Every structure is written in C-alpha cells, then in structure tokens.
Amino acid sequence: MHDSVLERVTLRRSLGAKYLTTPAPSKEDYAEALTWAIAAPDHCHLSPARFVVIEEREKFADFFEAGALADGADQEGAQRARSKALKAPAMVAVVAKIDEHNERVPTYEQWMTVGAATSNFLAALELKGFAGKIVSGSSTHYRDAVDALCKKCEVIACWIMLGTAKPDAPGAEVLSLI
C-alpha cells in the first residue's frame, strides 16, 4: 500500500456540515466509493448495507421537519431538524437489512459489516478529496424517510453528510501537509 494512501486514510476526521462546502461527490465518485464499500468483510455475502444518494433534499427536509413535529418538537426544533437535511452539500443514507433469523451470521456480525462498508465508503471518498460525517439519531427513524428509502426489514442505519472540507476546517493544517 502506498504510504500516502495510508497516511491520508489515517488522518481522516469527521467533519460536520458547517465545515463542508462544494463540490460534492459526483456519480462517478459514488460508484468508486461503492466498490470500496462492497469490499468490506461480509460473512456469507449477505450484503446488509445499501447506500442511497439523497437527490431530493427539499423532500427529505420536509420529512425531517414532519418527523421532528411528530416526535413532539416545537416549531423551532422542527426547523432545526429540517435544516439538517440541507446543510451539507450532499447527503447519503446508509440503509441496513439485518437478518435476525440467520443462524450462521449473528446480527452483531451483520452490523459490523454495515459499519465496515460505511467506513470503506468514507475512506474512498476521502481519498478523492471529500470529507464527511456520519449522523444518526432520531432522523433515522422519521417515518416518511423510512418509508421512502426502506424495503421490508430494512432500517436507516445513518446519514452521511458529505462535501469538500473548507480551508478552516479542523485538521485542515494537517491535511495541507500531505
């Protein structure tokens, strides 16, 4: 492995939306990242992770707002939830299908595969010059978002907020040394 690749991946840090700017990854960038994601360890080749690029951001902002209101948020809280779907230049959903009845592959192994695939996905995008952060919490359970993305027996494991790191992002001084 090239030392520069290893160094770049080990210097990767999560960067929230306020530290991200355009450009966002292209379809080609996502395709390459997916090849890394599917290379994750996967006992019995269950492929428990799917990555969905969210192109209809306003629609998902509506889902986040409605979900927050359904969870009891006031109008200000609902607007904060809404803004989370729009802040980063790009948003990807990690959808997991965990087979709880699989006798050969326990659920914890399947979740480890989802995590490894997500890590590989992020590492590939990092090597292409992008940055991002995994976000979970209540937004992964908002009914409209789940209904829009998930098939039977699937859940939203997390969201990945992506873009290009701003020059003043934490760790930018380290990345500039590469």
Residue ranges and their predicted role:
Residues 87-90, 130, 153-156:
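Short coil/turn connectors at secondary-structure junctions
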Residues 46-49, 127, 131, 157:
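Short secondary-structure junction motifs
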Residues 1-88:
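N-terminal amphipathic, basic helical "cap/leader" segment at the start of enzyme domains
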Residues 146-152:
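Short proline/glycine-enriched turn/loop segments at secondary-structure junctions
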Residues 37, 92, 98-146:
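Small-aliphatic-rich amphipathic alpha-helix that forms the alpha element of a beta-alpha
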